[in-house]
């Protein structure tokens, strides 16, 4: 049984449409969601969790439909997005105390472990943190309740190379423990270092969703595959 199955996800805005996105993610696998800026990655991730309400489509987590089991599902998921709205002048300790009330499986030992791993001072406020450290705070809160699935929007954005490498190592450890991870990124080398599967979006449409090994048969690297596709797409538009 897949940890996550998405069927026919659609969302329309005045100048953008997410069209018929379908993919599945198994336990203990990492899926990278790639695409250029504006491709629909963030809309897809937010639609999975009803942070954006899709126009159509079915989202199933752990065999449960999101529409009828949303609260139960969200207790089993960790989410971190680049635009998480914190109380910027409240101390991290207070944010953790508020967050843990929503998760029966909150683990204070795990919370303190990730504070140490990410060198976070819980007496500081988010307003005192750099962009990269705020990403680490998001991940600390997401990882502290033993989520079975992590959904992460650009988690390596703003991190220095050493911190990115450390985070990818953590992803690998979590995968080996059975956690499924879905994360968007424009840093394709991060995916090549740890992802099992790739879903590629372009202009709101799904171009491919398949194992990394199969996807890389299209070209020498994720970046080269994306650049080649986008170039061909541009040529077709110019020829119209």
Task: Identify the residue ranges that each predicted region occupies.
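Catalytic Walker B motif of ABC-type/P-loop ATPase nucleotide-binding domains
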Residues: 150-154
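Conserved ABC transporter NBD signature motif
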Residues: 57-68, 72-73
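Helical segment within the ABC ATPase nucleotide-binding domain
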Residues: 164-177
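Conserved beta-strand
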Residues: 6-9, 16-26, 57
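The feature captures the beta-strand-to-loop junction immediately N-terminal to the Walker
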Residues: 34-36
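Hydrophobic anchor residue at the start of the ABC signature
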Residues: 137-139, 159
């Amino acid at each position: 049984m897949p940890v996550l199955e998405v069927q026919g996800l659609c969302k329309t805005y005045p100048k953008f449409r997410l069209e018929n996105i379908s993919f599945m993610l198994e336990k203990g696998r990492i899926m990278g969601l790639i695409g250029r800026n504006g491709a629909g990655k963030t809309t897809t991730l937010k639609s999975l969790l009803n942070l954006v309400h899709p126009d159509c489509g079915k989202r199933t987590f752990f065999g449960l439909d999101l529409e009828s089991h949303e609260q139960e599902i969200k207790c089993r998921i960790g989410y971190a997005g680049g635009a998480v709205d914190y109380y910027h002048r409240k101390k991290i300790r207070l944010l953790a105390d508020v967050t843990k009330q929503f998760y029966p499986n909150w683990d204070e030992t795990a919370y303190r472990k990730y504070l140490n791993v990410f060198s976070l001072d819980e007496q500081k406020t988010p307003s005192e943190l750099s962009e990269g450290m705020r990403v680490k705070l998001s991940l600390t809160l997401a990882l502290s309740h033993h989520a079975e699935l992590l959904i992460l929007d650009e988690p390596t954005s703003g991190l220095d190379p050493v911190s990115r490498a450390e985070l990818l190592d953590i992803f690998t450890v979590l995968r080996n423990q059975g956690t499924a991870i879905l994360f968007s990124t424009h840093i394709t080398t991060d995916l090549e270092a740890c992802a099992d599967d790739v879903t590629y979006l372009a202009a709101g449409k799904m171009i491919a969703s398949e194992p990394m090994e199969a996807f890389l048969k299209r070209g020498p690297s994720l970046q080269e595959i994306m650049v080649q596709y986008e170039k061909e797409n541009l040529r077709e538009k110019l020829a119209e």
